[in-house]
A protein has these predicted regions:
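Asp-based, Mg2+/Mn2+-dependent phosphohydrolase catalytic module
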Residues: 1-15, 27-28, 97, 121, ...
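N-terminal helical cap/lid subdomain that shapes the substrate entry/recognition surface
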Residues: 2-118
Length: 250
């Protein structure tokens, strides 16, 4: 992305940001906590699989989180379904009380490992100093999101927080983006959205007629995906500092 203000963002008056893996390193915390919890609940499971259990839990190959964002299950039911699928992958039974025990081990490990990305506070502070309202839009639950923001110190740096359960629909449904804009007090065309997921964040925002940025922290994106976003006029961002730079924030 070029340095300095972006002409494509000249009309932007507010910013909406995804939370997980955009502001907060949720991936690393889930990997660590999922492995800890699986080792506690299923100590007889293959150790090589236990070591990968957190990664498997987060990857959610059965799509339970997607079903939750579409309103097909509750947040709690979604998480318990993912635990059940993880037990099957580990070759273990999900007995009575196992899901609760897994969560009881997972939550403290997750909270201990949770960190904000180092650029998050800097970028948010620069946006605020420049008078740009900021909102967070996430497909996670309200209580869980509030706890994550409190633990990482980001809760006081936002004007509006919109979650899947408080909105009644999730990304990439255009209604989620439009309602978040309404709560910020800006039109979609003048509200920049930035997130790390290609479909639910970058392309979802573009489909909602918003300027968007695709955050790719871990290297260059897949060439085919890069072509897709380039064709939609969506810049690829390496960090959140580029959001503040692109909006001309000192």
């Amino acid at each position: 992305m070029p340095r300095g203000p972006l002409p494509a963002w000249a009309r932007v008056r507010a910013v909406l940001l995804d939370v997980d893996d955009t502001l907060i390193d949720t991936r690393a915390a889930m990997h660590q906590a999922g492995t800890v919890a699986s080792g506690v609940v299923w100590p007889a499971a293959d150790r090589s699989r236990i070591a990968l259990a957190g990664e498997r839990f987060r990857s959610d190959p059965d799509g339970f989180f997607g079903a939750y964002t579409r309103g097909e299950s509750t947040f709690d039911a979604m998480r318990r379904a993912r635990i059940g699928a993880l037990a099957t992958w580990l070759g273990q039974e999900l007995g009575e009380g196992h899901a609760g025990a897994w969560l009881a081990a997972y939550e403290p490990a997750f909270e201990a490992a949770l960190r904000a990305h180092t650029d998050a506070e800097v970028a948010l502070t620069r946006l605020a100093a420049h008078g740009i309202p900021v909102g967070f839009l996430t497909n996670s639950g309200a209580d869980y999101t509030a706890r994550k923001l409190a633990l990482t110190g980001l809760g006081g740096l936002v004007d509006v927080i919109c979650t899947r359960d408080t909105l009644g629909f999730g990304k990439p449904d255009p209604r989620a983006f439009h309602e978040a804009c309404r709560r910020l007090g800006t039109a979609p065309a003048e509200t920049l959205y930035v997130g790390d997921e290609l479909l639910s964040d970058a392309l979802g925002a573009a489909d909602a007629d918003m300027p968007a940025g695709w955050l790719v922290r871990d290297g260059a994106p897949d060439p085919g995906e890069a072509d897709v976003v380039a064709g939609r006029g969506i810049p690829v961002l390496a960090n959140l500092i580029q959001v503040a730079d692109g909006l001309g924030c000192p």
